Structures are given as structure tokens and as C-alpha cells.
């Protein structure tokens, strides 16, 4: 299946699984999606993730979602920069999600990082998504 926007597909799968309180969700693998899952784990939005291979020898990322009792840890996921409308931000204009309570995932020349890391390293880039 061909996807126009694989990052939006990943975020939608996580959002939908989170909405119905699933324990885990499988996402087709790419290095960019793996790095986004890594950031979500580092920031405490998911409990874990691992790379699994299915019977067709295709790699998937299995994301284990995190809940605080019956409360969802991920309140929202939003795709910002889309294939039809790219959104770039300089270090000075880097957005703050919910006044710093959420994170922005940014693709920079130093890799895919959070908005806080991008500010610390003084680099701008493409704002991929907001998570809160």
C-alpha cells in the first residue's frame, strides 16, 4: 500500500490505538518513524517500542502505549508539516506546545529532535508534529 504521508499514518495509528486503550500498535518501519518512537519513549509518552519482523519479512515498529491507571498519557497528537504544506521554523520562532507542557518534534540538520533540543543546539527545521 502506498502512503502519501507515512508520518501522519503513524500518528493516526497511535492516536486511534490510544483512544480505545490498546496495549500496543504495529506501524510499518522506517528510520524516521523509529526516531519519532524513540523521542516519544524518551519523553515518557509511550512505555516502549521494538522492531519486529512479520512473516513476509517486513519490519514493523511495535509501540507499547502508556496509561496512568485509566488515564491516557498522550492527550493529543497533531501533524503540523504536511506534504502539501511544509512548515519550517527558525530557532527564534520555534513553537512551544501548551506553554512548554507538550513537545514539538522537529526535523533539523542534526536529526529529528524535540523543540527543546533544537533551541539548545540553536537550529531550526521542519516542524513535524506536536505531542501533548
From Swiss-Prot:
Q: Kindly list the biological process annotations in GO that this record carries.
A: translation
Question: Which PROSITE patterns does the protein's record reference?
Answer: RIBOSOMAL_S8 (PS00053)
As recorded in Swiss-Prot or TrEMBL, the protein's gene is named rpsH
Superkingdom of origin: Bacteria
- Pfam families associated with the record: Ribosomal_S8 (PF00410)
How is the subunit organization of this protein annotated in UniProt? Part of the 30S ribosomal subunit. Contacts proteins S5 and S12.
What's this protein's name? Small ribosomal subunit protein uS8
One MF term in the entry's GO annotations: structural constituent of ribosome
Q: Which family does it belong to?
A: Belongs to the universal ribosomal protein uS8 family.
Arranged from A to Z, the UniProt key words for this protein are: Ribonucleoprotein, Ribosomal protein, RNA-binding, rRNA-binding
